[in-house]
Amino acid sequence: MESFVTLYVLPGLLILLKSVALIVILLVGVAYILYADRKIWAAVQLRRGPNVVGPWGLFQAFADLFKFVFKEPVIPSGANKGVFLLAPVVAAGLALAAWAVIPVSEGWAIANINVGILYVFAIASLEVYGVIMAGWASNSKYPFLGALRSAAQMVSYEVSIGFVIVTVLLAVGSLNLTDIVLSQRDGLGTMVGLPNSFLDWHWLALFPMFIIFFISALAETNRPPFDLVEAESELVAGHMIEYSSTPFLLFFLGEYVAIVLMCALTTILFLGGWLPPFDFAPFTWVPGVVWFVLKLVAVFFMFALVKSFVPRYRYDQLMRLGWKVFLPISLFMVVATAAFLKFTGLV
C-alpha cells in the first residue's frame, strides 16, 4: 500500500497541482493578452481602447468574464442540446490540454515526452471538432457554413504546419520540445563568432519555414486576415452565432488559448525558447522563463498588428495560398533540408 501511494498517488497529485496552476496562469495570461489585443487594435485606429474598468482598463477582461458567467445561456429550440453544450467544452478543453507538454524553461513542463511536438500537432488537429459540433448542433445555416469553412481551412494549413515540423525534426533529430530548444545553441551564429546568440536560432537558418509557420498559425487559429470562419460581414460570428453566456465564453477562451499556444510554439521552434539572445551578462542574468514570455509576447504583438492592418482574404484566395503556395514551398524546403544535411554529413 505504501509503495502504491509513493508510485502512483503522490505523482498523480503533483501532476494535478501542476495542471491547476498552469490553467490559472493561462487564464490570467489570456485575460491580459486579450486586453493587449484590444489596446493595440485601438491604437492603430487612433482610439483609447478599454480604459474604464480599473487603472488604464486593466480589469476589463475580468469584468467581461463576470458579465458572461452571470448571463442566462439561451439554447435554440431546434438545437441538439447535448452536442450544443459539449462543443465549447471540447474546444476549450483541447486548447488547454495541448499546454501539458509546452516547456517554458528547462524542466518546466507538466509532461516532458519525447513526441511533444507530435502531441501538440495532434491536439491542434482535434480542435476543429468543437467548431464542427457547434455548427451542426446549432441547427442554423450560418453556424454550419462557418463550421464547414473551419474544417477546410484548418485541414489546408495543417498540411503546411506538418511539413514545417518535419523540417525542424530533420534539423534537430528529435520531437522533444526541450531538445528542439537546446539544439538552437549552435548554428549560424557560432560560425560568425557569436555562439549561443539569436543568430543560432532556427528563424535564420529556416527563415522560409518560419514565415510559413507564422502565417499558417494565423489561419489555424482563425485570426485575421484568415477569420473567414467568423467573418462579421458575412456570417456575423460564424459557428458561435447561437451561443451566449458561459458556452460562448468557453469558445472565446479556447480561441485565445490556442493563439497563445501558437505563439509559444513559434517561440520554441524558431526563436530559441527560453534561451537568451546573447550568452553573456546581463542577458544570462535574466531567468529563462522571462525570456520565453518576452518572446511569446513579441510574437503575439505581430499577431495583433496583422489583425489591425491586413484586410480579410476571400475564401478562394485562402485556399489558393495554402495549397498552391505554402504546400509546394514547404515540401521543397523539406527535401532541400534533408539533402543539405545528407551532403554536408551533419546526419
Curated annotation (Swiss-Prot):
Top-level enzyme category: translocase
Its membrane topology: Multi-pass membrane protein
Coiled coil: none
Catalytic activity: a quinone + NADH + 5 H(+)(in) = a quinol + NAD(+) + 4 H(+)(out)
HAMAP family reported for this sequence: NDH1_NuoH
Cross-referenced PANTHER family: NADH DEHYDROGENASE SUBUNIT 1 (PTHR11432), NADH-UBIQUINONE OXIDOREDUCTASE CHAIN 1 (PTHR11432:SF3)
Name of this protein: NADH-quinone oxidoreductase subunit H
